[in-house]
């Protein structure tokens, strides 16, 4: 798993520094990679909800990146800064104590709030247990986020000007839309390309109609470039491509986004 980690300057915040050490031990134990590029699975943000933190969250949400936010007791009744409700409900908020959990859960009732205790400040947990719980949380976030992305794609397909009654065409289009989302994340996985190729090799649908829909969605150029990448890296062949493949600059960008 690859994550991006962000926190405000430590300054004299010993609690934050100690918790970062706990996180680092967990990442090492779980073989979690800290990414220094745009190819990561999840963004983990730590610390008080400063302007910089809020902007980081907003930017990630625009890119549809799953976010885990650990305020580390910096959101409390006496705090001057908070996250607005519309933003909070799109986050997974990690609390480290029962009082913090109860307050956050009450304040942001629509948010995903999780309690995983911090072994740096309590004997109620251990580093080993924390490692396991953090890994499970990361996996839960990725699973829920991916399910939501696919559900949103299904909804967008039902709103097309050109209606799709064919379940097979719906599935093929959904696969292209999902790969386009992953392209935006710079994270096109081999297994996802293989699944799309296999579907296209066995599917029977109106290719001309799909081409029209791809133009409606402004996905025509992307799919034509993607087909070239899929032909080279997956089992797709020309006879099963719904539109002509191209090999231009966009194709190179798509290829560089594959993992």
Feature names for model-found ranges:
Residues 1-45:
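N-terminal pre-catalytic "stem/leader" segment of glycosyltransferase-like enzymes
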């Amino acid at each position: 798993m690859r994550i991006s980690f962000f926190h405000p300057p430590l300054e004299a915040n010993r609690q934050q520094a100690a918790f970062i050490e706990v996180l680092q031990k967990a990442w090492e134990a779980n073989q979690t990679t800290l990414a220094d590029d745009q190819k990561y699975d999840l963004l983990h943000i730590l610390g008080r909800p400063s302007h910089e933190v809020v902007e980081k969250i907003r930017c990630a949400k625009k890119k549809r990146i799953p976010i885990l936010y650990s305020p580390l007791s910096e959101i409390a009744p006496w705090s001057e800064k908070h996250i607005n409700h519309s933003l909070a409900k799109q986050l997974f908020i990690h609390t480290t104590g029962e009082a913090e959990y109860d307050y956050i859960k009450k304040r942001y009732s629509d948010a995903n709030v999780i309690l995983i205790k911090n072994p740096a400040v309590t004997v109620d947990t251990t580093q080993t247990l924390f490692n396991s719980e953090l890994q499970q949380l990361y996996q839960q976030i990725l699973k829920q986020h991916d399910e939501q992305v696919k559900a949103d794609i299904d909804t967008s397909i039902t709103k097309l000007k050109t209606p799709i009654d064919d379940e097979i065409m719906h599935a093929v289009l959904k696969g292209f839309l999902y790969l386009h989302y992953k392209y935006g994340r710079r994270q096109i996985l081999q297994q996802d390309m293989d699944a799309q190729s296999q579907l296209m090799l066995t599917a029977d649908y109106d290719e001309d109609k799909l081409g029209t829909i791809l133009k409606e969605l402004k996905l025509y150029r992307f799919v034509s470039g993607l087909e070239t990448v899929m032909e080279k890296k997956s089992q797709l062949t020309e006879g099963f491509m719904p539109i002509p493949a191209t090999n231009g600059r966009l194709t190179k960008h798509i290829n560089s986004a594959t993992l």
